[in-house]
């Protein structure tokens, strides 16, 4: 996998189609469906492929504007959250990209935006280039549920990535309700790992079961002593009651065994947490894994009390499709 271009790429992509992100309204997507903006895979070029409206493009593309104004798309994020940064990707759009773009946001507990909705500008107009990634950090701790993506005056954008921290009203969770505290939809975040050569570490926190091997976390073959690992920050502190390690689609490349450590972390940077994790207590002792299967652990879990972070160790290497860490929220 390619290296992270910017630090905020490690946050959850709130605009991922797999989380349910979709277009609510769009001024014009004549040439290319605006919902393609949210596909998790990189944009592709299809040489010589045309449809009824022109050249097929992997992204959102509007018609050439012949009057005043600009194009925009109203987006419902798959999960509300605070935004840390965005990537406006114009891959393969060369003579047809917008010269600039901006981003507005709002939070609605229910329903969709209308003409009375108050929008907050989170990214003022920025210049765009063709066939390029445009990374912009955003400093706003408010949670947003919808975006309005403006392009000036028209053109095409391949992907819109919106990285941030998912929002959940934890006060509404019942005292005895069991929640997947590691789920991306609940604010869980993969912080660091030993290796992610074949698949991103963040994939293991996505909803549903993996669609293929590429939709999981997979390391390179280990040729040195040791083992691979990934550290996850839980969406909320909690007491762990059940753990699911899913090796779906991993058959000749699943880990032989796994274990999990946990801790209640009160401070420190992501890099400091990586070092601290060596000394965390054992939450789940070493367990044998099988290929292409869900492994559920309950009785095997050690009672550590409330924790905020876990470290999944896989021995010696291999792939994991999903990790579920279920428990009760610490009030």
UniProtKB/Swiss-Prot annotation:
A GO BP entry: purine nucleobase metabolic process
Enzyme class: hydrolase
EC number: 3.5.3.4
Keywords, comma-separated and alphabetical: Hydrolase, Purine metabolism
Single Gene Ontology MF annotation: allantoicase activity
Catalytically driven reaction(s): allantoate + H2O = (S)-ureidoglycolate + urea
Recorded metabolic or biological pathway in which this protein acts: Nitrogen metabolism; (S)-allantoin degradation; (S)-ureidoglycolate from allantoate (aminidohydrolase route): step 1/1
Annotated NCBIfam families: allantoicase
PANTHER family, per the entry: ALLANTOICASE, INACTIVE ALLANTOICASE-RELATED
Protein family (similarity comment): Belongs to the allantoicase family.
UniProt protein name: Probable allantoicase
Species this chain originates from: Pseudomonas fluorescens (strain Pf0-1)
Gene that encodes the chain: alc
């Amino acid at each position: 996998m390619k290296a992270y271009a910017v630090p905020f790429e490690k946050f959850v992509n709130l605009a991922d189609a797999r989380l349910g992100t979709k277009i609510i309204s769009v001024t014009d997507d004549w040439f290319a469906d605006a919902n393609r903006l949210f596909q998790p895979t990189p944009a592709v070029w299809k040489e010589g492929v045309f449809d009824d409206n022109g050249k097929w493009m992997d992204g959102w593309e509007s018609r050439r504007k012949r009057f005043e104004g600009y194009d925009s798309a109203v987006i419902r994020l798959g999960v509300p959250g605070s935004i840390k940064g965005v990537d406006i990707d114009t891959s393969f759009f060369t003579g047809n990209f917008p010269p600039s773009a901006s981003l507005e946001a709002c939070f609605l507990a229910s329903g969709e935006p209308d003409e009375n909705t108050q929008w907050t500008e989170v990214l003022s107009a920025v210049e765009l280039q063709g066939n390029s990634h445009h990374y912009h950090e955003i400093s706003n701790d408010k949670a947003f549920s919808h975006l309005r993506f403006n392009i000036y005056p028209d053109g095409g954008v391949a992907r819109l990535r919106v990285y941030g921290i998912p929002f959940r009203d934890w006060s509404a969770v019942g005292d005895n309700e069991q929640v997947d505290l590691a789920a991306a939809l609940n604010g869980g975040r993969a912080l660091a790992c030993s290796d992610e050569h074949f698949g991103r570490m963040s994939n293991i926190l996505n909803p549903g079961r993996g669609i293929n091997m590429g939709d999981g976390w997979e390391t390179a073959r280990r040729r040195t002593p040791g083992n691979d690992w990934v550290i996850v920050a839980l969406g909320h502190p909690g007491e762990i009651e059940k753990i699911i390690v899913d090796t779906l689609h991993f058959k000749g490349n699943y880990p032989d065994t796994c274990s999990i450590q946990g801790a209640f972390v009160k401070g420190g940077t992501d890099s400091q947490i990586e070092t601290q994790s060596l000394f965390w207590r054992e939450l789940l002792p070493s367990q044998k894994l099988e290929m292409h299967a869900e492994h559920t652990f309950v009785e095997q879990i050690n009672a550590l009390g409330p924790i905020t972070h876990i470290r999944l160790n896989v021995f010696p290497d291999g792939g994991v499709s999903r990790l579920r860490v279920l428990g009760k929220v610490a009030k």
